[in-house]
Amino acid sequence: MLAHKASHEGVLVAEVIKGHNRVYDAKTVPAVVFTDPEIASAGMMESECRAKGFNDLLISKFPFAANGRAVSMQETEGFVKMIADKKTHILLGVHIVGPEASNLISEAALAIEMGARLEDVALTIHPHPTLGETMMEAAEATLGHAIHIIQKPLTNGKSAHL
């Protein structure tokens, strides 16, 4: 399930042997489980964030049930969970359970690799209606201004849909 990781590491080793200066950051390697629904993850889990000293976190889940494309596909089970540093809004982890999670996680891996902030993801226009919109909506929810779900107010950095 991590053939993509092994392939990337092989290329990296070959480039280092050739004398190229390369950097490898394992935190951005996406993990995917091809179940129904699919499960995908990139970056850190909440417990890992806290273990690394990120104690003030913004965390939210956006349900696929609130996404038009998921509804039209009758694939509404699951969510996109985002974890970010409360002070900087830098995205630390994304965890997806739901339709096409294996494809959606790539945007999260790129955002984490780039050091993107929640605002970067939230302000990126996503085509409508697509499952990809769940990434934008999850970022908006994590910032506390989702428009397609009713949110409880942010408490202790956590937000949840009602």
Region annotations inferred by a language model:
Residues 1-28, 89, 130:
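Rossmann-like dinucleotide/flavin-binding elements
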